[in-house]
Swiss-Prot record:
InterPro entries, per the entry: YjeF_N_dom (IPR004443), YjeF_N_dom_sf (IPR036652), YJEFN_prot_NAXE-like (IPR032976)
Protein name per Swiss-Prot or TrEMBL: NAD(P)H-hydrate epimerase
EC number: 5.1.99.6
Native source organism of the sequence: Daphnia pulex (Water flea)
Function as written in the Swiss-Prot or TrEMBL entry: Catalyzes the epimerization of the S- and R-forms of NAD(P)HX, a damaged form of NAD(P)H that is a result of enzymatic or heat-dependent hydration. This is a prerequisite for the S-specific NAD(P)H-hydrate dehydratase to allow the repair of both epimers of NAD(P)HX.
Gene Ontology molecular function terms on file: metal ion binding; NAD(P)HX epimerase activity; nucleotide binding
Swiss-Prot/TrEMBL keywords: Isomerase, Metal-binding, NAD, NADP, Nucleotide-binding, Potassium
Cofactor note: Binds 1 potassium ion per subunit.
């Protein structure tokens, strides 16, 4: 176990704004998505048939990047993207996945389909800006994920969780087998007890000091670390 601190929602948003100003969203998203793919490769090396469930915001963008890198790592990813974002960045990320011949599902997979076809489902729906309730475009896929037996890996925040208080309804909240926190763990990670990785190796010492972050050392050239 590596000792680490947590970010509340307001500090997570403020840190992201600073990072965007220094690096730009494209660079950060590429690094974050790569670290997610690397963590999945460490945590689930044999789970080659992966579905990435992509949301409309930055968390979804991380998922698209993650899918592309998983493909290059030898996985067989597929993507379910129920509400596409009409912005150049997301359109380009989608085209990149298509260039790598990653299939996009045209219909919401059933719980039975999630169980029979995939060995891992990556939850890249909502990030730390999420506020309940879940919008109707996403209720079906989240409900199917709630009832699947296939393990789930959530990027940064398990979708539907409160960013600070964790699962609001224990019986109707995702219970991922793995969580990949980005930049720094958010407060809700205190309620997570599975495989926990940290990715996003781009926090400068000055920012760590400003936000009072205690972060683990990344091993060697790795871009993720298990907490």
């Amino acid at each position: 176990m590596h000792p680490h601190s947590y970010l509340n929602q307001s500090d997570a948003i403020a840190l992201d704004v600073e990072l965007f100003n220094y690096f730009g969203v494209e660079q950060l998203m590429e690094l974050a998505g790569l670290s997610c793919a690397s963590a999945i490769a460490e945590g689930f090396p044999e789970s080659k048939n992966v579905l990435i469930v992509v949301g409309p915001g930055n968390n979804g963008g991380d998922g698209l990047v993650c899918a592309r890198h998983l493909k290059m790592f030898g996985y067989s990813p597929e993507i379910f993207y129920p509400k596409r974002t009409a912005k150049t960045l997301y359109e380009n990320l989608t085209k990149q996945c298509e260039l790598f011949e990653i299939p996009f599902l045209t219909a919401c997979p059933t719980t039975e389909g999630l169980n029979s076809k995939y060995s891992l489902v990556v939850d890249a729906l909502f990030g730390f800006s999420f506020k309940a309730p879940v919008r109707k475009e996403f209720t079906e896929i989240i409900d199917n994920m709630l009832h699947m037996s296939t393990p789930c890996c959530s990027i940064d925040i398990p979708s539907g969780w409160d960013v600070e208080n964790g699962p609001l309804d224990q019986d109707n909240s995702l219970k991922p087998a793995m969580l990949i926190s980005l930049s720094a763990p958010k407060l809700c990670a205190r309620f997570f007890h599975g495989i926990h990785y940290l990715g996003g190796r781009f926090i400068a010492p000055a920012l760590a000091t400003k936000y009072k972050l205690k972060l683990p050392n990344y091993p060697s050239t790795h871009n993720c670390v298990r907490l």
